[in-house]
């Protein structure tokens, strides 16, 4: 590793010297801002002005990268990039795919002079080079690039994120956006946690009523797939194909033998009577038949549903109460590592073998272990045993939205200033220790039913993604102070053609003098930090009449239950204690941020819907906060010590006006 780094520096210095000589030693452009930070940069004089043409050298694989690049370039800066052949001319962008050991499997070289050239030895490296050019392009009004040379090789080969889709359904549309966001920031691993369950204390202490879901279409066990949201096998395959185009590896996770309530709901006889129905019974042969059949469905054949090289088998948080169950857990873990490998995949596990210390051998060679808590898996001992470690320390990089424990929002300042993947809990390894593959962060949706939406998750996820991408790529070598990083990162898009936060440019407003029923506005929604104002001459509105709808939310002039001003998103109905009376003219304003949604009537604050701490003892105390949809499950708290913080945020919908009778005038939306 050290020899390779020396060679990279030698390559960089050689490139810089030749570049500087050609420009008469004029080197004035400072290192440009991108995320993650460029590892090495030598500035030159002047700016590169794009011609709108690109050349590809490297065959069909490079052509595919170039096509994605051109489409993203057009989406991001509004200018077209078209292919050409022959020698490059001033303003052309050249993509070169050729062997170069010094760049490794993901590094690239970026030469920006009269011609911009991206050189990489792998498709992945070429993709990352295009992401850098895109970020540089969007920061200049004419898409001009600062002249100079960058040699950019990541410190860690695995840079990732895990999404808990089991406790909360995350729509495929968002996962596709997430792939593009991760790629834009050179994060190359997305782990999708496909099954999990809520906490029993929120569901009357009854396992049979406790939320549980397996999110993937399943033919082997008809009826297993979640009814409140799932992915078809076809769309899951398409997600992986999209990820491959963008340099992102999908790691699907089926979590067994704990966190398995979705499976015991389907087949109760394989649930543990001793440790709880969220645990599989490790001593029941039917358990192994069931789990074998489940993995087999997605792993067998020439074109399996799980396309990637790695499959995660879970093995998280099983009881270690007795010696015999510990040994059986170790047997189970070893069995499914080898079972996954029998289909040509690398197995990944959650670290648990310190918690489950025993005599039964568990395969370690070529096994990926996610080290999340050192009490469950001592990382130095796991290194000694031969596991390949992924640094995902719970006390630093776990987001559990609005739960009151772990992080609601990561401490990005602390992570940026002090953390790298070499830090696993309180254990510090040498940087680039070969046993550490890289680092990840995670979103765990522990409190199923707490009102959190995908928009809320995104608000927590995105700044963490930008920060962790830097710390996993640039490592300890970041040179920019955090405050400057935190300010400049806001100038970058989430990804080309992606705006999940519904951010508007500064100063942008939407003004409609007379809002007509059914009118479209040209805007889908507006994100946190908005103010929506309008005047209403009230009419006799039917219950369930919207003011506005979008794909993600509805704002009601008269809600479906009581006819109040209200909003609904993702199955949660939240009502203001205010009705617009027939024949009355009032001025309404709605403001919203990441914590609350507020109603103003005639200029005065009428009601603030913020986080609501619930200690409910009866089901009726929660139902008023839930969707009127009778198929929606509703969490119940029987234990006053089990507190849930119910969230009432809203990204305001603007896509289409409802079919209302009232007269709505003076609509003004600001951000």
Model regions and ranges:
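Feature activates predominantly on carbohydrate-active enzymes
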Residues: 102-279, 286, 292-310, 339, ...
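Hydrophobic faces of well-ordered beta-strands that scaffold small-molecule active sites
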Residues: 159-163, 190-192, 250-254, 309-313, ...
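Extracellular glycan-associated modules
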Residues: 503-671
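Active-site beta-loop-alpha junctions enriched in small/polar residues
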Residues: 166, 195-199, 255-259, 316-318, ...
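Bacterial Sec-dependent N-terminal signal peptides
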Residues: 1-30
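Flexible, acidic glycine-rich loops studded with aromatic residues
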Residues: 361-367, 374-513
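Acidic, contiguous N-terminal accessory segments
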Residues: 6, 25-154, 347-356, 363, ...
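Active-site neighborhood of glycoside hydrolase catalytic domains
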Residues: 263, 268-367, 372-385
